[in-house]
Design a protein with these regions (language model features):
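Hydrophobic alpha-helical transmembrane segments of small proteolipidic membrane proteins, enriched
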Residues: 35-59, 169, 176, 182
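Membrane-interfacial helix-loop-helix connectors in multipass membrane proteins
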Residues: 168-185, 254-260
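Polar-ligand-bearing catalytic/cofactor-coordination segments
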Residues: 44, 53-159, 192-260
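Post-HExxH zinc-binding segment in Zn-dependent metallohydrolases
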Residues: 152-176
């Protein structure tokens, strides 16, 4: 009886070990498939981002050739919107480059690209009003803008190092997994920043379009064009946020896979 008992135990152990190896192989195959899926999604977002970026430039170039009915420049549009909103202490300046327009809450300046600053087109009016919309958000203590502004110093520092930390973390994931985990935490911060940016940009466009219409800056046809231009600008932020999320999931997959 002991002989048969030992033999049964031996075969049972063999069976369990076989099942364990099968399970490990299944996990590896699943991980490889998931990582491949994440890569496909990531590459898809890169292609989509390029398409949206090219479309955005095409839209702005198209609408930059259509003059605003009242002939106002981007600077004049921004100045009038600030006056109408009762906002003071905000400076309007010109910066070099295309689509480099932005509002800086740190020094309360609306920075418009030269084309927008001097331009008297639909594009110039839409962009100038959008950036002024950020100044309105700041003046009215819009919560999401406050959250984003609070994250700017940390994200600015993180963005300089996160890719190097992630690269080193992936190379050393088996021996020093904590490095990759640190990179994931830092990258998660930039992903969070991308998603917080969405409501900020969408709200600024909403304020801009409402004011352009209510103030009589744009006719009905002009308004549709301005809305189209700002819609495509918003798409770039959506794609950026989703692409960042896909990359974050990819890094998490690598980390969790190394722990098995």
């Amino acid at each position: 009886m002991p002989y048969f008992s030992d033999k049964m135990t031996f075969f049972f152990c063999q069976d369990e070990i076989g099942k364990s190896f099968a399970t490990i192989e299944e996990i590896k195959i699943w991980e490889e498939n998931e990582i491949m899926n994440i890569w496909i999604i990531f590459i898809g977002f890169m292609i989509l981002s390029w398409i949206v970026s090219m479309t955005l430039k095409s839209k702005f170039n198209k609408y930059s050739k259509i003059p605003l009915d009242n002939g106002m420049s981007g600077r004049e549009v921004a100045e009038k919107m600030l006056r109408d909103m009762g906002i003071t202490g905000v400076k309007i300046g010109s910066v070099e480059g295309q689509l480099t327009d932005h509002y800086n809450p740190a020094d309360k300046t609306i920075n418009l690209s030269r084309e927008v600053y001097e331009g008297r087109s639909i594009s110039s009016a839409a962009v100038a009003a959008h950036e002024t919309g950020h100044a309105v958000q700041h003046a009215k203590a819009y919560a999401w803008l406050g959250f984003r502004s609070a994250l700017v110093p940390a994200v600015s520092f993180t963005s300089k190092w996160v890719q190097w930390i992630l690269l080193a973390g992936i190379l050393l994931v088996r021996t020093f997994p904590a490095l990759l985990l640190a990179g994931i935490v830092l990258f998660a911060l930039t992903t969070l920043f991308s998603f917080i940016t969405l409501p900020v940009e969408i709200d600024a466009s909403r304020r801009a379009l409402a004011w352009l219409s209510n103030a009589g800056i744009t006719s009905y046809q002009n308004q549709q064009m301005a809305q189209d231009a700002l819609k495509w600008a918003a798409y770039t932020y959506v794609i950026t946020a989703l692409g960042s999320l896909a990359a974050l999931l990819y890094y998490i997959m690598i980390f969790t896979g190394s722990r098995r």
